[in-house]
Amino acid sequence: MVEADHPGKLFIGGLNRETNEKMLKAVFGKHGPISEVLLIKDRTSKSRGFAFITFENPADAKNAAKDMNGKSLHGKAIKVEQAKKPSFQSGGRRRPPASSRNRSPSGSLRSARGSRGGTRGWLPSQEGHLDDGGYTPDLKMSYSRGLIPVKRGPSSRSGGPPPKKSAPSAVARSNSWMGSQGPMSQRRENYGVPPRRATISSWRNDRMSTRHDGYATNDGNHPSCQETRDYAPPSRGYAYRDNGHSNRDEHSSRGYRNHRSSRETRDYAPPSRGHAYRDYGHSRRDESYSRGYRNRRSSRETREYAPPSRGHGYRDYGHSRRHESYSRGYRNHPSSRETRDYAPPHRDYAYRDYGHSSWDEHSSRGYSYHDGYGEALGRDHSEHLSGSSYRDALQRYGTSHGAPPARGPRMSYGGSTCHAYSNTRDRYGRSWESYSSCGDFHYCDREHVCRKDQRNPPSLGRVLPDPREACGSSSYVASIVDGGESRSEKGDSSRY
């Protein structure tokens, strides 16, 4: 509610800009003694067109308001009425009232309250005197001030341009935020999920599938060159056979191959003659460590470990069905440098990896299709052989039961393991040439390398070790690796 500011205080609005305090006191002093004349001015000390006059007697103020209201003063009609306090200034500091002209106080009050209720300034003069130049600046000032504390959204009562601008800006801001959220979420869907799928699929291809990893399948199923560098070398039966046994073997073989640097490889896998087998190779689990280290060596390390190997890796590993997948993986994918990387170390652990009679035969046939899915296949080798491997193992077992480990080549039928192993002291010479093929028919069909070693035909006269000895005994392997005459064979298969 608007209440009277002071009983003897009047608001005079619509004054001429030239009217000053002395003129007002002279005109209104006729009605009674005046205690105060307050002319409202702007920053430039010019009159704003309204003033407040305080009479000592309230009755004199009422008489002056009735007499002077609507009359002309210095060429302009003025408005005189009782000064009122704004609702937010009751009991506080009093604001000067503006002058009114030719309008009733009640009408001005209703209009001001209806249109701009709650704004600052003196209510009787806020509505009707926008054209006289006296109160317009105060109205604009009050209007701008009134909007500052009320910033909760578009004002229904004041409804000026600023709220209209602010509302669309807020909407646009929210829309732009929502629009940006949409593409961002869409980008997340487009770019975040497929890499995860690709990772899963690659994981499946690396660990779940045996036929499509480039181990023992057609050329079209082999991985890329980089994948071959990581995964194809183990296709000789090493790492994937190790991965099929236990998680410990898998992490040891793959982890060391993927994460060890060349310097670490030199530290952990020295190129001593059969040293890797003597240190790590007495169990299948230990083989994964030595193989994992050797598979990741760079060409420089391989040249340091095995200088003479320049193309004989195919001849070493390609002449048995067991080595067929490995030779194909090498022939199809790695470069000559990769061949130098992976092929030369065969003289160190070729017998270690392949030299177990029935056990190795199973690794050639069984591991490519079965060993990645069960641990028992890798643990109990003599009980889980495939058909042909089992037949070959029995034949070998029948001819070599109770025979001591021989340095001569090991033979088998059906095109399976029939490479001649003869360890040599000259391991940096041509020891890999001692792995000559005897009857590898599958390799001839697939790779068109049908050069059988004519100098060492297959014969059962050269007895083989007991499969149980080949599987379980590490002393047998150590004796073969450490002691043996070099039966290096320079055949027509030394050049591929």
From Swiss-Prot:
Key words of the record: mRNA processing, mRNA splicing, Nucleus, RNA-binding
One GO cellular component term noted in the UniProt record for this chain: nucleoplasm
Region (Disordered): 67-349, 452-496
Location of the RRM domain: 8-85
Quaternary assembly: Interacts with splicing factor proteins SFRS3/SRP20, TRA2B/SFRS10, KHDRBS1/SAM68 and KHDRBS3.
Additional record remark: The RBMY1 proteins are encoded by repeated regions of the Y chromosome, mostly within the AZFb region. The exact number of functional copies is unclear and may vary between individuals, and some of them may represent pseudogenes. The proteins are very similar, which makes the characterization of each protein difficult. Thus, most experiments do not discriminate between the different members. One can therefore suppose that reported interactions with a RBMY1 protein involve all the proteins.
Protein name according to UniProt: RNA-binding motif protein, Y chromosome, family 1 member D
Gene expressing this chain: RBMY1D
